[in-house]
Amino acid sequence: MTTMNTNANVTVKSVLWFSRHTMTDDQLSDLKRIFGEDIIVHQVSASATSFRDVLEAGKDDDVLAVVLPPAMLADLTNPRNNQKPVIRAIANRVPTGQMVVNPATGREEEQFKFEHAGWERVIKIEVVTEKL
C-alpha cells in the first residue's frame, strides 16, 4: 500500500471511481502502480447532483476518483466539505487515423480516441464567475 500525502497521511486501500464510464484497464493498472496491487476500486456509475452524492458513495473509501463538472469539483475539494484526497484521470485526445460522419453536422471529420495519460490529485478548484 502507498501512503498518499494528505493532511492525515492516509494509507490507501480503497478508491471510489465515480463516473458514468467504466474504468479502463490502463487507468486501473496505473492506480495499482500508485497505490499498490491490493487496491480495491469501488465503481459508482451515476450522475451526481451535488458533491454530497460523491461523499455518500465514497464514505467507506480512502480516495475519491471522480469525473465531475468544475463547480462540483470545487465543492468536493473544499476542506470544509471533504478531507479525503480527490483525484482525476488525465487523458490525451489521439487521432485514430479514421474518418467518421459527425451525426450532429452530417460532415465527415477525423475520429479521435482518449488514451490514459496518468492521474492527478485535485488540490483546489477556484470558480470565478460574473453575472451577465
Describe each PLM feature range.
Residues 1-62, 74-132:
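Long, low-complexity, Lys/Arg-enriched
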